[in-house]
Amino acid sequence: MKLGKILVPLDGSMLAEGALSNAVDLAEKYGATISLLRAAEAFTMPGADAVEAQATAVREAEEYLAAVVRRLANRVIGRVETHVGCGAAAAASVEAAAVQKADLIVMSTHGRSGLGRLVLGRVTESVLRGTTVPILVVRADHAPLDAPSGARQAERASHV
C-alpha cells in the first residue's frame, strides 16, 4: 500500500483529535505526510461584518492548527502540513482531499452503541459520500495526543 498523504480533518474538538494517533502511526509506518485541515466557517448576525467574521474564523483556525502541530512535534517524525478550508466542514474536507491528492482520510466518530452505532457522524457520513478517497473512521473513545489544557476555550468563552 502506498500512502503519500493522509488528510486529517479537525474541528477543534477532542473527539476529532482522537484520529490523530492513528494518522501519526500510519504516517510513520508508510513515510506519509500528514495534512491537518480545519474548516473556517463564519456565522454572523444580521448587520455584522461578514468579511471580518470570516477573517477572524480563518485566523482562529490557523492558530488552532499551529497549536496541534506544536503538540505533535515530539511524536511526528515525518512532515506535517496545515490547511484552512472555507465553508462547511464536510465540503472543505472533500475539496481538500481532491486538491491535495490525499491517499487516505482519517476521521473520528462517536463510539455509540445500540441504534446510534448504525449512523456515523453527520460530517463523517457526508465526507464518505462525497469522496472516492478511502476513509479510516476511528472510534474516538480515547483522549487525543497531548490533550490541550483548555485555556484557549476558556479565553474564547470569556469574550462571548
Language model region names:
Residues 1, 15, 70-105, 143-160:
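Structural beta-alpha unit
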Residues 2-49, 140-143, 153-160:
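Small/aliphatic-rich secondary-structure junction motif
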Residues 37, 81-85, 136:
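General small-molecule cofactor/ligand-binding pocket signal
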Residues 52-63:
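A short acidic, glycine-rich active-site loop
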Residues 104-126, 144-148:
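Glycine-rich, Arg-bearing micro-motifs that act as flexible, cationic patches
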Residues 108, 135-139:
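Short beta-strand elements of ligand-binding domains
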Residues 123, 131-132:
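Short, structured coil segments at secondary-structure junctions
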